[in-house]
Amino acid sequence: MMTRESIDKRAGRRGPNLNIVLTCPECKVYPPKIVERFSEGDVVCALCGLVLSDKLVDTRSEWRTFSNDDHNGDDPSRVGEASNPLLDGNNLSTRIGKGETTDMRFTKELNKAQGKNVMDKKDNEVQAAFAKITMLCDAAELPKIVKDCAKEAYKLCHDEKTLKGKSMESIMAASILIGCRRAEVARTFKEIQSLIHVKTKEFGKTLNIMKNILRGKSEDGFLKIDTDNMSGAQNLTYIPRFCSHLGLPMQVTTSAEYTAKKCKEIKEIAGKSPITIAVVSIYLNILLFQIPITAAKVGQTLQVTEGTIKSGYKILYEHRDKLVDPQLIANGVVSLDNLPGVEKK
């Protein structure tokens, strides 16, 4: 029988071996054959079966449940459902499983009855709205941060008295738009409106009401609503998307971003909405690079009136020397002479 001393001697080790090794006091075999039996919580010698330790804590990863695991009638999950901080309930409730019974109809009826008793009615309504918000955000290809911010905004506002009488669609539309602005994801008022098909007047009123509510609740919740950022995303965030819709090259996009940055220095245009500044900056660079796209086409594609584009262009034309990257002019890429003049009244 091999002993600890004989193994150390054969390996050529010198000095005392300070390693602590659990060995079986009955077998005294080295190296020991110790087995951890997590099902019973015991540490057992594999040779003689002597229990060396009990009450063993299972340090392995928890079992998980996937969408179709319960079809076989056996659910290995021990951890339960993850809690949702957006819901009022504490998510600790009893559920009726399928089990091994053959009467599936009885099981479904029992599960339904249990759900009516345990589930909070308010949570059911909120969960239905969350599912709708998720579906709409997925349709618009919005990131998860927007979904979370929209759900938080809806949760904070949906049961307020000031929103009574407002349609569910307008509240969800306002929540998604607030979520976009909170997450600094560029989406316009009209884009969200076309996504949900809600009337402009009702949408606008609901949005203003929810803004006022959130200003008073901005310090609550796990997602703080920053009301200072709710005036609209910066105009630079719109330009790449708008240029993509128009099929413009990257050089035009970069030049339009330069123009939009410089617009902050012009008092006549600085007070305009970020969308207007973005569209007008793009239109000026379309003319600068002599791309055959009309103002009517730009307005139709980006959902801005042609009059708004032309009136904004008149302001930019007066300050054209400040709005075009001088490096492009120095390299001969563009010329200010490419910009058509504006008739003065």
UniProtKB/Swiss-Prot annotation:
Q: Where is this region: Disordered?
A: 65-93
Residues annotated for Zn(2+) binding in this entry: 24, 27, 45, 48
Segments forming TFIIB-type zinc fingers: 20-53
Q: Which GO terms describe its biological process?
A: DNA-templated transcription initiation; RNA polymerase II preinitiation complex assembly; transcription open complex formation at RNA polymerase II promoter; transcriptional start site selection at RNA polymerase II promoter
| Record keywords | Metal-binding, Nucleus, Repeat, Transcription, Transcription regulation, Zinc, Zinc-finger
Q: Which PROSITE patterns match?
A: TFIIB, ZF_TFIIB
Report the subcellular localization: Nucleus
| A Pfam family recorded for this sequence | Zn_Ribbon_TF
Q: Which domain of life is it from?
A: Eukaryota
Q: Does the keyword Zinc-finger apply?
A: yes
Q: Keyword Nucleus, does the record have it? A: yes
sequence repeat residue numbers: 136-212, 242-318
Which InterPro entries does its entry note? Answer: Cyclin-like_dom, Cyclin-like_sf, TFIIB, TFIIB_CS, TFIIB_cyclin, Znf_TFIIB
GO MF entry, a single one: RNA polymerase II general transcription initiation factor activity
Q: Where is the composition biased (Basic and acidic residues)?
A: 65-78
- Where does the UniProt entry say this protein principally localizes? nucleus
What's the further remark here?
Present with 6750 molecules/cell in log phase SD medium.
Q: In UniProt terms, what function does this protein have?
A: General factor that plays a major role in the activation of eukaryotic genes transcribed by RNA polymerase II.
The record's similarity note reads: Belongs to the TFIIB family.
Question: Subunit composition?
Answer: Associates with TFIID-IIA (DA complex) to form TFIID-IIA-IIB (DAB-complex) which is then recognized by polymerase II.
Protein's name according to its UniProt entry: Transcription initiation factor IIB
Name the source organism: Saccharomyces cerevisiae (strain ATCC 204508 / S288c) (Baker's yeast)
